[in-house]
């Protein structure tokens, strides 16, 4: 009884980001995790200074971030060196990330500003290079599209921007 509800397009309020495009050389040192002793990886960076919520906001089938208002909304994480401050949300997040990695829709490496108990288990169990605790904040110093290299040796991770992107 009564008229059907009217659905309108409620565009999400953009989540605040402090990221600005960087163009100076950048290299920093961080930490690895005990389950990983040595690795080298390079690739294109996908960067945000806003936490990522895997459960409900990263499509489990495609790896595309689907969080209206998030700076990376609509962007796939597949084959990226994924750089973000930390995960957020449920303790189910590692299982979502593990599924993405297992099916080939996950990142090739994960860099967190802070050690992340929602991200670390998936990276550790499936052998995805994981780094955290950098001297300088990679979420503000690396641009999406930068070519980066990471090397873990002796528990220390070196992150270096090899080539800067021309746009963010």
Predicted regions and their residues:
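Intrinsically disordered, low-complexity terminal tails and inter-domain linkers enriched
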Residues: 3-25, 163-167
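Generic recognition of long tandem-repeat/solenoid scaffolds
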Residues: 155-163
